[in-house]
Amino acid sequence: MTPASAYLTDVRVQFEKMKKLAEGALAQVTDDELLATLDPESNSLAVIARHMAGNLRSRFRDFLTTDGEKPDRNRDGEFEIEGSPTREQVMKDWESGWQVLFATLDTLSDNDLLREVFIRGERHSVIQALDRQMTHHAYHVGQIVFLAKHLRSAEWRTLSMPRRRQRP
């Protein structure tokens, strides 16, 4: 395995872990909690999931050949949810973004890593663009876990090693 292919494998593994962590948190909340906000300026879990999905679809559709900020993306609209989407609608949207990401990752070769891509007109190597996306998504996954844990309170089931537990 080359260092480049090891990197691509690790990127996929890290994104898979982030997706699983967020889904573990989202699965614990009620349908009402999925739409709840802490205050008028905060985002609900559904809004965060919608934004992440929209970001993935924009960044990774035609990744190597078009700017990552697609003209048909309505970023501001990702933060405005009209009505009360169902859990199924939220998760269908969520999954569609991840499918675009993973399909693109599956097509990248070692030689693609030093190619240039653009995000909002800013030049990045593919490595930089992937790292930028991992950072962005880790931030939002942290928000999802924090908000879900807050909403579930005493009913929260940890997604990692519980406190006061010895490691084997």
For the regions a language model picked out, list residue spans one by one.
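Acidic/histidine-rich alpha-helical segments that form the ligand environment
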Residues: 79-117, 127-137
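Short, contiguous alpha-helical
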Residues: 8, 12-16, 20-26, 31-78, ...
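Short, charged, low-complexity loops and linkers
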Residues: 1-12, 80-82, 89
